């Protein structure tokens, strides 16, 4: 029991310490796994299947699944007999999903409570980042998710 708790604590810590770059890559890997299943077998992918295919700690995958649902990229549907068993399906037509669109949706989700127009510096930073995001959105390197399948 204690070793289980220690292992779980280690996993939770790992999930918090995962780099932003790695988190983005796992987000896309999870989306690819779900879309591949959706297009191949049809229907939603059980969470345990996603974890098994990616061979990543449960906590990290769960965090990312939660983020993708919050961001409106995946929908969670009950699966199997258990209350806790959940499967995931794309929330939109996979044909229209782009790599950057998914990342941007996740980055934007959450409660915005800060007014970024309060200082000149924040206003300038906001404008620069919006320009950069627009460039990424329009870039030919912003491939459709299905092009990575």
Residue spans of the language-model regions?
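Pore domain of cation channels
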Residues: 1-2
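Short flexible coil/turn linkers enriched for glycine and charged/polar residues
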Residues: 80-84, 96
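Non-catalytic alpha-helical coupling and interface elements of nucleotide-dependent molecular machines
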Residues: 5, 35, 73, 107-111, ...
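Non-DNA-binding regulatory cores of transcription-related proteins
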Residues: 91-149
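Residue-level detector of functional hotspots within protein domains
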Residues: 83, 88, 131
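Short, surface-exposed, charged/polar-biased interaction segments
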Residues: 51, 71, 82, 109, ...
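Non-transmembrane accessory domains of multi-pass membrane transporters/channels
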Residues: 6-80, 88-89
